[in-house]
């Protein structure tokens, strides 16, 4: 795993979303090369996977708390 990949995994959900917005802006610029666009796409894909995973973790925790409340 690369250093950049490790840093991305530690990123907060909010920072990941902000970076995704930045990537979209960069990819929409006509001066962004094809190679740069591909690198940005790969970074965005990794960030989206991390965000989806965090959302699933939060949903599972909410369900767990809700189930505990129902059992009480």
From Swiss-Prot:
HAMAP family: Exonuc_7_S (MF_00337)
One function term, GO molecular function aspect: exodeoxyribonuclease VII activity
Domain of life: Bacteria
Record's keyword annotation contains DNA repair: no
Cited Pfam families: Exonuc_VII_S
EC nos: 3.1.11.6
Subunit-level organization: Heterooligomer composed of large and small subunits.
Family indicated by similarity: Belongs to the XseB family.
Name under which the protein is recorded: Exodeoxyribonuclease 7 small subunit
Function: Bidirectionally degrades single-stranded DNA into large acid-insoluble oligonucleotides, which are then degraded further into small acid-soluble oligonucleotides.
Keywords: Cytoplasm, Exonuclease, Hydrolase, Nuclease
One Gene Ontology term, aspect cellular component: exodeoxyribonuclease VII complex
A single BP term in Gene Ontology: DNA catabolic process
Subcellular location: Cytoplasm
Chief location category: cytoplasm
UniProt catalytic activity: Exonucleolytic cleavage in either 5'- to 3'- or 3'- to 5'-direction to yield nucleoside 5'-phosphates
């Amino acid at each position: 795993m690369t250093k950049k990949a490790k840093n991305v995994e530690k990123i907060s959900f909010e920072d990941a979303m902000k970076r995704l917005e930045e990537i979209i802006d960069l990819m929409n610029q006509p001066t962004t090369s094809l190679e740069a666009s591909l690198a940005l796409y790969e970074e965005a894909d990794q960030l989206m996977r991390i965000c989806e995973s965090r959302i699933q973790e939060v949903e599972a925790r909410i369900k767990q708390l809700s189930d505990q409340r129902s059992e009480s």
